[in-house]
């Protein structure tokens, strides 16, 4: 939400297409942004719903993750996706049986797994834009897909690095394309439109998700206002207490102001 719009602005300015692999939870919380990604000509892939480590996730859990995210995309955009990028280490190259198993599950769900070898590790804490650019350039011969992150933490350095990465590779004869074009396919082939007989159901799903989106943002704003009012009330009470304390102190220090009653008893 904080960095994706800035990245989209840069891509639009540079006339560069990209493929965004999105998490279901982020889709649910950023419906207008997901629409913007698609409407500006980019592609969207599945990155599971909650970003679990698929090496230690059951097959059934993975299927639910993939299907939920796909259903959410279909209900919002009217288009599905066959592109899938697994979370964590599996996104580069499977190195063990568990990683292979997770890719097999995705394949059985009719997904095409997309991996990446040019990974500048922009997610590392404290990494600077210059380092991200240098790593991308250093590994340019390792593959043909550059992996960058727009969520999951502070991505301000990624935003700074993006323009430099684009400028360098274009200057050296590279052309940026989407994953579908890299595969020799069209966007509609990797993001096929929802079948007509399912469109009514998808519209109902969209209405439900949109109401949920509005409600969550309303609650967020409501609680924020409530917290601010509580803080304001506490500050007001504290201020009044300080003023009252000063007033009482001032009265104590003024001689002759206080004249208590005196009773005289004559036997």
Q: Model segments located where?
A:
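Active-site beta->alpha N-cap acidic-glycine motif
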Residues: 1-81, 86
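Hydrophobic beta-strand scaffold residues
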Residues: 18, 44, 112-113, 176
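Catalytic domains of cell-wall/extracellular-matrix polysaccharide-remodeling enzymes
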Residues: 28, 52-168, 174-175, 181, ...
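Short beta-strand/turn micro-motifs at beta-sheet edges
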Residues: 32-33, 40-42, 134-135, 250-254
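Juxtamembrane amphipathic/hinge helix adjacent to a transmembrane helix
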Residues: 172-210
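N-terminal membrane-anchoring/stem segments of glycan-assembly enzymes
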Residues: 195-258
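Cell-envelope/extracellular polymer assembly enzymes that use nucleotide-activated donors
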Residues: 260-263
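Active-site beta-to-alpha loop of glycosyltransferases that engages the nucleotide-sugar donor
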Residues: 266-267
């Amino acid at each position: 939400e904080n960095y994706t719009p800035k990245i989209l602005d840069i891509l639009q300015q540079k006339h560069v297409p990209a493929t965004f692999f999105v998490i279901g939870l982020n889709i649910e919380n950023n419906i207008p942004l997901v629409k913007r990604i698609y409407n500006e000509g980019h592609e969207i892939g599945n990155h599971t719903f909650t970003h679990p480590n698929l090496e230690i996730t059951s097959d059934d859990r993975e299927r639910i993750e993939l299907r939920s995210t796909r259903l959410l995309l279909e209900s919002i955009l009217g288009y599905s996706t066959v592109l899938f990028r697994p979370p964590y280490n599996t996104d580069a190259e499977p190195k063990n049986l568990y990683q292979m198993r997770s890719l097999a599950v995705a394949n059985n769900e009719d997904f095409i797994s997309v991996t990446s070898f040019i990974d500048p590790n922009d997610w590392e804490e404290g990494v600077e834009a210059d380092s991200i650019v240098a790593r991308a350039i250093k590994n340019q011969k390792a593959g043909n897909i550059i992996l960058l992150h727009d969520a999951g933490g502070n991505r301000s350095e990624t935003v700074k690095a993006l323009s430099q990465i684009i400028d360098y590779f274009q200057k050296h004869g590279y052309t940026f394309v989407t994953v579908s074009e890299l595969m020799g396919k069209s966007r509609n082939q990797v993001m096929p439109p929802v079948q007509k007989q399912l469109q009514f159901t998808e519209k109902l799903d969209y209405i439900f998700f949109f109401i949920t989106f509005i409600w969550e943002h309303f609650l967020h704003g409501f609680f924020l206002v409530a917290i601010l009012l509580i803080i304001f009330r506490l500050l007001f009470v504290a201020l009044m207490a300080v003023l009252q304390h000063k007033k009482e102190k001032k009265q104590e220090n003024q001689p002759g102001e206080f004249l208590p009653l005196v009773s005289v008893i004559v036997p």
